[in-house]
Amino acid sequence: MAGNRPFNKQQTDNRERDPQVAGLKVPPHSIEAEQSVLGGLMLDNERWDDVAERVVADDFYTRPHRHIFTEMARLQESGSPIDLITLAESLERQGQLDSVGGFAYLAELSKNTPSAANISAYADIVRERAVVREMISVANEIAEAGFDPQGRTSEDLLDLAESRVFKIAESRANKDEGPKNIADVLDATVARIEQLFQQPHDGVTGVNTGYDDLNKKTAGLQPSDLIIVAARPSMGKTTFAMNLVENAAMLQDKPVLIFSLEMPSEQIMMRSLASLSRVDQTKIRTGQLDDEDWARISGTMGILLEKRNIYIDDSSGLTPTEVRSRARRIAREHGGIGLIMIDYLQLMRVPALSDNRTLEIAEISRSLKALAKELNVPVVALSQLNRSLEQRADKRPVNSDLRESGSIEQDADLIMFIYRDEVYHENSDLKGIAEIIIGKQRNGPIGTVRLTFNGQWSRFDNYAGPQYDDE
């Protein structure tokens, strides 16, 4: 407490002397911090915004304090000053003055808080205790559900636990958010420009895609970007995304993280061996390999084992919370991540929103964008396309073809579609050619890039054919 003497000292002493009361587990809280916040607001109304960014009424432990803070918010909203007299009058009109301790308690709050200088720190304490209490409440709820499952399976109980914890994590205020002075923004911007100027990068300022023409369009996959790769079945979206991962892993030392919700890790590894070794993936899958194939694969394995920077998580039905926590762990252990790839977005789930698919997808895409910003890493998420494009004469995808497209299109920084004409036209003149259609790029041009598709190797390569109009 900021004052010279604590509030309710007699009550505290009685509790300490009573062994039965002392043995009770009291939820974590700080009466002194709460009183200092309330008293500080009465002393300096200008600190309201600092406090309101950190706490809400429910963060206060005692009911009287919740009522007082709520009434302060009402006064602030109406443009009225917050002081001993106005607050007492307002509480009196609401019939709550006696329930909060009367005029005497409000006067004590004001008197025993000498200044509002440290009110932000006190508000942080109040919020911290509130989060811990909420965690305890959720833990008790989960325990009760375990003792009395009411027909729910262990999977259902895990979903319940995850969703409750997820809500707590999402509700926490991020102190790094909010307005920044232009001086701070300029400093960071100039530092980034100087870094780019001093480092030779051939125009690639992000993660190198491994594809020259794509790098020219995008300058690489940028940190903090959510990148959507979408295509109809058989176009090679998993292959393309894996090639991006492989190229990133080979061209840098930072770890790359794959969340494969559809395909087991062994199949992912077989595809990578085929791609990097340029050995027919059918021969790898069936084990029909000759000496040259084995030599190529052994060489690739040696490189992969030397770098050891590819991580694969093939857990199914992952939630945004699980993806975030696992990515954080890898980033913490290795000092960062080079690239995250998720195959595919629609297989993720949010148990609390499972009844509304549109809201669920919106939460997933929002969470992936937040993850990209938090870890300052490009996140590549694969997405399905609506079947409706099959009815068009020109089956090249557009942004509106994204399944549950609204939120995905809004959150994405870069959207790339894969189109191979030979999938629809057997005698196409474009056999072996893939079009990477950039449908959206927040900080760059849209257009089309051609790549060569080598399906037998599960690989896209740089296109070396004649020039074409990509617009």
UniProtKB/Swiss-Prot annotation:
Q: Show the Pfam families listed in the entry.
A: DnaB, DnaB_C
Q: Where is the SF4 helicase domain?
A: 200-467
Q: Does the keyword Hydrolase apply?
A: yes
**Keywords per UniProt:** ATP-binding, DNA replication, DNA-binding, Helicase, Hydrolase, Isomerase, Nucleotide-binding, Primosome
Cellular compartments per GO CC: cytosol; primosome complex
InterPro entries to which the protein is assigned, alphabetical: AAA+_ATPase, DNA_heli_DnaB-like_N_sf, DNA_helicase_DnaB, DNA_helicase_DnaB-like_C, DNA_helicase_DnaB-like_N, DNA_helicase_N/primase_C, P-loop_NTPase
In which residues is ATP bound?
Answer: 231-238
Q: Where is this region: Disordered?
A: 1-26
Q: What is its EC number?
A: 5.6.2.3
* Reactions that this protein is recorded to catalyse: Couples ATP hydrolysis with the unwinding of duplex DNA at the replication fork by translocating in the 5'-3' direction. This creates two antiparallel DNA single strands (ssDNA). The leading ssDNA polymer is the template for DNA polymerase III holoenzyme which synthesizes a continuous strand; ATP + H2O = ADP + phosphate + H(+)
Q: Which GO terms describe its biological process?
A: DNA replication, synthesis of primer
Q: Which GO terms describe its molecular function?
A: ATP binding; ATP hydrolysis activity; DNA binding; DNA helicase activity
* Leading EC class: isomerase
Record-stated family: Belongs to the helicase family. DnaB subfamily.
User: Its function?
Assistant: The main replicative DNA helicase, it participates in initiation and elongation during chromosome replication. Travels ahead of the DNA replisome, separating dsDNA into templates for DNA synthesis. A processive ATP-dependent 5'-3' DNA helicase it has DNA-dependent ATPase activity.
Oligomeric state and partners? Answer: Homohexamer.
Q: What is this protein called?
A: Replicative DNA helicase DnaB
